[in-house]
Structure formats: structure tokens, C-alpha cells
Amino acid sequence: KQEIKIWGTITAASMVCGVISDRIDIIGIISIVILCLLYHTVNRINLILFIRVASGVLAIILSVMLAAHLIPGFNNWKVIDSVSLTETSLPYSMYLNMDKTLVGLAILGLGFPLIKSLKEWGSVLRSTLPIFLVGLIVLASASQAFGYTHWDFKFPDLFFVWALINLIFTCVSEEAFFRGFLQKNLFKIL
């Protein structure tokens, strides 16, 4: 499959870059390799169901532990350090979390692709964008009405760094795990 080669290559390249930049050590590599083996076992339809289910449960546990930064072997890079965007905002920090990112890349690299074509992108956007916009308006309005937030619109200098990191390092991983692995396998079981 073409998408497996692309995502598998991205996963391997990310791990190599992590080792070269001293962001991943041998324990981190071993944990990701084990995770890949577990994901691969879940996909093997010729194996006994018990082994596939046990591998899936272990993959979920290891994925959550990696995403929660409970497994050593990763030296995540702090790219934003205690920045306050306004006088009333709390300080904000952001990391490039390789452990969480590699969970998503491993899922995509082993055959759990989310979207395979531009046509599928269009379909997904048509079905989710209206829900997203309504949810955004309702939540923002409620938050404002109850006094949890106040409008202080600005376009901070770190927006593009924040958006890129959030998209690549957070959204891709979470979508791959929750939709590409968990939801897909629960759907198969049910």
C-alpha cells in the first residue's frame, strides 16, 4: 500500500531525526518499536482473536503512557516557555512531544490511514465543518456569558509556531489514535 510506505517512511525519518538531535534515546526507540509490533499484530487477521485483542489492549495502554509522557526515553523540546499573551492570561508553555507524535505516526505507518484522497477530505470537511463552527460559537458564547473568558483579540508573534506544532504534533497523533486505531477497531468488534 502506498500510504503505508509514506507514513512508515515519515515515522522512521522522525525517529532517526530524534536520535540525531538527542530527543530520543534507546528506551524511547524500544518503546516505539514495541508499539509498532503491537499495532502490526492487531492488523494480522490470520492470528488468533485473543492475541489480536491482547495486542490491541497493550497497544492502547502503551500509547496512552507515551502520550502522557510516562515512558522515559524522550527529551521533548520546549519551544515556548512561560509566555503570557496578555496581562491577565496565565503563562503558556509548549513542547514538541516526540513520544506522542510517534504514537500517531506509528499508527498511520502501519496501515491505519485516516484519509486517503482529496475526495475523502472534501467529504470529511462537509460533514464536520458545520458541527465545528456551531460548537465553536456555542462554547465561545457560553464561556463569555459565564465570565470564564473575555475578548482580547490579537495575533501573537508565536501563532504560526503554535498552529504548526498543534496541527502536526497534536492533532495528527490524536486523530490517528482515536479515529484511526481505537474507533476503527471498536467498530470492527461491535
Task: Report each predicted region and the residues it spans.
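C-terminal ends of transmembrane helices
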Residues: 1, 38-46, 113-120, 178
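Short, amphipathic, aromatic/basic-enriched membrane-interface segments that mark the entry/exit
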Residues: 1-4, 19-26, 125-129, 186-190
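Alpha-helical transmembrane segments in multi-pass membrane proteins
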Residues: 3-107
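Small-residue packing motifs within transmembrane alpha-helices
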Residues: 4-10, 131, 162, 176
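Membrane-helix interface segments
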Residues: 4-6, 155-159, 190
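Juxtamembrane helix-loop-helix connectors linking adjacent transmembrane helices
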Residues: 73-170
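Hydrophobic transmembrane-helix microenvironments that flank and shape a buried ionizable site
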Residues: 170-176
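Membrane-interface helix/loop boundary segments of multi-pass membrane proteins
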Residues: 176-190
